[in-house]
Amino acid sequence: MKPQSINSTMDSTIERLGDKLKTIGEVRERCGVGSISFGILHHGEVIFTGSTGHRDVLEKKEPDTSTLYTLCSISKSFIAAALGILVHQGKCKWTDAVGRYIPEFKPKGDVRVATKATFNDFLRHSGGLANPVVTLLGPEGKVLVSQEDFINVLNDAPNGNERFGTYYSRTWEYSNVSHGLLALVIERISEKRYADFISEEILKPLGMNDTVVYKSRLSSDANIAHSYVRLSDGSWCKQPDHEWTNECNTPVLAMVGIRSSIKDLLIWSAATMDAQWGEESKPLAALSNIEMNPLREVNSILNKAYWTRPHKDDLQTLSNFHLSWYKCVMPSSMVHWGSWNMSLADNGNKDQNYINENILGRDSPQQPLYKITGIGFCGTASVNLFPKTMSAVVVLGSGLNTGDPSDFTAAIMIQALFDLKKQIDIIPMVSYEREMRLRDWKSLKNDWNKHRDIYSVEHPAKEYVGEYTGLGITLTVRANAVSEGLQLIFNGREEIMQNLEYYNEDMYSYQPINRDNWLRGGWLDWDHFMVGILHFKRKNGLVSGVTWVWERGCDAALFNKGNT
């Protein structure tokens, strides 16, 4: 643990923060991840930073304020900021239909997704596109689709389902791919590669010199927090390095691939608040080395267009999703919004009494909170802005295992920073979350076993061999050259070939059902037993396609077999 007080005077606020270092170490241990780094901005000044664990567990290298973590969905805040600059320059409007800038965007189904859905719509996740991210991001951190082929994913992405109907302007449907679309539009409007625009228009003017949008910056000796997770036997596993940070694949970089540090995200937080609430007569200390804040249209990003995010806590304060940022008013259960702590906020496993009992600052004055979070197999991240005091709490974690360490650490530091009442003991929440995540896995595995029937008719493997196209990619099923089984290849990526296991008649499974193997492989969420199962379909007795339930609750996507 390496705390570092920036202020020369250890006032009561900094003392409270320092008292929480041991607790944050416990969070990391119980969540089973390699490292956590954090920083606190208060009254526009960086007052506290720290870290726990190792950015490289095997070599015992500790993280610091410049250590690089993958931002995952926090990357999306740069999309909104880039569009804000372009809107300010008069090159586009928030209310423009996005499809006018990219005519090859021709989604199947609801054409309004291209002809009417605006920048506002897509940034607040009401543009109508679903989230088939598993067709983009494969196991072991591999990217499955090139930038050139990304348009095929967009055009194939569902824009409704059988139960609900169309999504556009009717519901909040979180969509990574829609943000990839916006990044491509930014390239069209600016006539620059997205990475170049972000670097030249945002990162360099703000002095965010740690932040990485170019693959070449990721050398073997770079100050990177590698993703480590603790396995069931107590050993540490280094997960695969991902391919998400690459300027040559704008959609993936913009959605989830930017890497940054605590130092730079504190600048990012200060610049965002300064652009909206700053006063020229009172420059923020955190921006003392900045000649000019390049951020524009921040009020439009943070406070105008939004989609409500209803929740069921007993306080019922404001809860809206704006343009890449979420806004609530504390006290609220939604302080934990967007995290991988599934027992909190509006996430899946809901015990409302438990949620209400653990609301931070229930007896403290109300104040607005703006936040954005990131979740990936490689780690979690949490950025929290408090404009009332020009404060920010930023947390970055490497690895994802049993709970969201960044969210818990943010809660600990928010509570200490503002001395919230009544105080909540976070550690029992961490233990409960860990128990729930392991229980969920056991339940998932039980469902997988319950629906399996290995005694059903198994047809000759050669009937399934072929290429199946859908959702913008190709699934290749081939015979195993060594055994009598089948193998699955995602969109030509031979290096992540998966052996298929017989599951039921015309059904084969590729997902690991051993949790340690799931962690080793760097898989995305496996939240339903059918997500890892291919269900082959027949026409006139011959295999004609395969359906894939790629996400809990989605309609099964059909992949058509070639030459049928």
Model-derived segments and their meaning:
Residues 45, 54-56, 110-376, 381:
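Short, surface-exposed loop or secondary-structure junction motifs
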Residues 27-33, 61, 361-364, 373-377, ...:
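Short loop/turn motifs at secondary-structure junctions and domain boundaries
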Residues 93-110, 204-206:
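Short, glycine/proline-biased beta-turn/loop segments that scaffold the active-site neighborhood
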